[in-house]
Amino acid sequence: VKPAIVVFGLCVSAAPAWAVCADDKVTVAGDWGQASFSVDVADDNAERAQGLMFVDNMPTLTGMLFVYDRPQSVSFWMKNTLIPLDMLFVAPDGEVLRVHENAIPGDLTPIPGGDGIQMVLEINGGLSRRLGITEGDVLQHPSFGAEAILPCGEKTDG
């Protein structure tokens, strides 16, 4: 247990830091600090349809980033999803517009993200609350364009 706590402590920080901007990394920053997640990117219809279906275990600071070509209304469900998930619905500038916590595995009830969503970050259920992630926090990733609140190469203010 102690090694996991040490690793977690190194990955989540309240101090400003240079975020690593890579396709397989997402940094989430807010008043609580910041956390970097290793992610798989789902940026086409087939990958988005598959999502995290049939995944039975996911390391703590890992997730999936769903990327859309343009802002739109999105809705998710948990069909064939085996683990609880938190969903962060994100605007084109990287601002978290909605957080849905602890989506129920296998539940077919639609989970609406709202309008103007460009990306969705799925992480382990309950992790948003444990870290303090809320609406208004900001994501940093290379997929955000010139309108990004926190462009790649910029310091995150945790």
Can you say where each PLM-predicted feature lies in the sequence?
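Bacterial N-terminal signal peptides that target proteins for export
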Residues: 1-6
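N-terminal signal peptide c-region/cleavage motif recognized by signal peptidases
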Residues: 13-17
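Compact, glycine-rich, soluble single-domain proteins
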Residues: 20-158
